[in-house]
């Protein structure tokens, strides 16, 4: 797949503070790439440099192999969607969507045609005459997205666009955004701190921490094979166990809990159940390993977990193939 954007040893300093040390990243044309990390990790700064709202202190940004460090945002064939929609309150949906084209002096007939298609793709046709105050948060976000895609950008940049919405609406819009990206076939670069959001929508995920890239991979690769201690603790739930000089990660769904009579492998350790949590269709057991004093998490079905009570002595263990060695 062709690389549309290249980030080559880019750094960003604010005064004497290094926000992003040398960082390199290739972004493929037509992919849904998510930059994921905690607050303050540098993900929004990276996005703003790609968009042209921040200038790299060092390094180069390339679009189609052309250097764009000094190219203004409006010449980059990119559009940015923020968490705060910045809609014009006195304009209806259609006029908000057409505003950028009007400023660019796009012919009125073409404005109408392109706005119609953008509203169709974002399911806004029936709301075209409403003003923002008469729209829900999700509908306002759709207007912001329609306003961005109506310009036919090569790349759509999204900075935590669903952060202000409630849980159900966020889930609905996650599916809509992924479907929209598939239909448009353009590159989406999406910034979020929400790992579930990243997992559900992305073709690839870039995990950032303190300005560095910790790991790049598909959602399955990031989840099943975390490379570093940070990724293992940030993505999903993991049991982190010391192994010689390093650490291994074991997902709770791979940890087995057996009665003393059912001990299967000699590697299983004696432990006792400290707590049991109901988590929907599963129960989460917290087992204190008597040998290592580690508190381990294990998932079981409600039927499997029904045999246990807090304080029960059990054996706990896992298959060696389920261990992931961490850097």
Swiss-Prot record:
**Residues at which ATP binds:** 37-44
Q: Which gene encodes it?
A: potA
> InterPro entries from the entry?
AAA+_ATPase (IPR003593), ABC_SmlMolc_Importer (IPR050093), ABC_transporter-like_ATP-bd (IPR003439), ABC_transporter-like_CS (IPR017871), Mo/tungstate-bd_C_term_dom (IPR008995), P-loop_NTPase (IPR027417), PotA_ATP-bd (IPR017879), Transp-assoc_OB_typ2 (IPR013611)
Q: Which family does it belong to?
A: Belongs to the ABC transporter superfamily. Spermidine/putrescine importer (TC 3.A.1.11.1) family.
Q: What is its main location?
A: membrane
Into which EC class is this enzyme placed? Answer: translocase
What this chain does, per the entry, is described as:
Part of the ABC transporter complex PotABCD involved in spermidine/putrescine import. Responsible for energy coupling to the transport system.
What is annotated about its quaternary structure and interactions? The complex is composed of two ATP-binding proteins (PotA), two transmembrane proteins (PotB and PotC) and a solute-binding protein (PotD).
Compartment(s): Cell membrane
Give the UniProt keywords, A-Z.
ATP-binding, Cell membrane, Membrane, Nucleotide-binding, Translocase, Transport
Query: What does the record give under GO molecular function?
Result: ABC-type putrescine transporter activity; ATP binding; ATP hydrolysis activity
Q: What is its EC number?
A: 7.6.2.11
Membrane protein topology class: Peripheral membrane protein
Q: Where is the ABC transporter domain?
A: 5-235
Pfam families with a match to the protein in the record:
ABC_tran, TOBE_2
Under catalytic activity, the entry for this protein gives: ATP + H2O + polyamine-[polyamine-binding protein]Side 1 = ADP + phosphate + polyamineSide 2 + [polyamine-binding protein]Side 1
From the Swiss-Prot or TrEMBL record, give the protein name.
Answer: Spermidine/putrescine import ATP-binding protein PotA
Superkingdom is Bacteria
Gene Ontology cellular-component terms for this entry are:
ATP-binding cassette (ABC) transporter complex
């Amino acid at each position: 797949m062709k690389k549309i954007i290249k980030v080559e040893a880019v750094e960003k300093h604010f005064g004497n503070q290094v926000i992003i040390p040398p960082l390199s990243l290739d972004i493929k044309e037509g992919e849904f790439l998510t930059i994921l990390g905690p607050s303050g990790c540098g993900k929004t700064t990276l996005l703003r440099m790609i968009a042209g709202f921040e200038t790299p202190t060092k390094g180069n940004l390339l679009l189609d192999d052309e250097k764009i460090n000094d190219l203004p945002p409006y010449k980059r064939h990119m559009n940015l969607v923020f968490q705060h929609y910045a809609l014009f309150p006195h304009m209806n949906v259609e006029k908000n969507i057409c505003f950028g084209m009007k400023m660019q002096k796009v012919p009125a007939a073409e404005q109408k045609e392109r706005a119609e298609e953008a509203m169709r793709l974002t399911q806004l046709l029936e709301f075209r005459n409403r003003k923002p105050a008469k729209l829900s948060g999700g509908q306002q976000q759709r207007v912001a997205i329609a306003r961005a895609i109506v310009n036919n950008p090569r790349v759509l940049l999204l900075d935590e666009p669903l952060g202000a919405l409630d849980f159900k609406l966020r889930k609905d819009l996650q599916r809509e955004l992924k479907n929209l990206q598939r239909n448009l076939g353009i590159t989406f670069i999406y910034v979020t701190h929400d790992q579930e959001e990243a997992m559900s929508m992305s073709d690839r995920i870039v995990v950032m921490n303190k300005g560095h890239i910790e790991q790049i991979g598909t959602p399955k690769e990031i989840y099943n094979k975390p490379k570093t201690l940070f990724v293992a603790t940030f993505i999903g739930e993991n049991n982190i166990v010391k192994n010689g000089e390093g650490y291994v990660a074991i997902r709770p769904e791979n940890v087995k809990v057996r009665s003393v009579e059912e001990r299967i492998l000699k590697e299983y350790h004696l432990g006792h159940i400290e707590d049991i949590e109901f988590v929907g269709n599963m129960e989460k057991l917290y087992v204190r390993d008597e040998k290592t004093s580690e508190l381990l998490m294990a998932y079981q079905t409600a039927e499997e977990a029904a045999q246990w009570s807090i304080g029960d002595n059990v054996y706990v263990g896992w298959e060696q193939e389920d261990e992931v060695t961490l850097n």
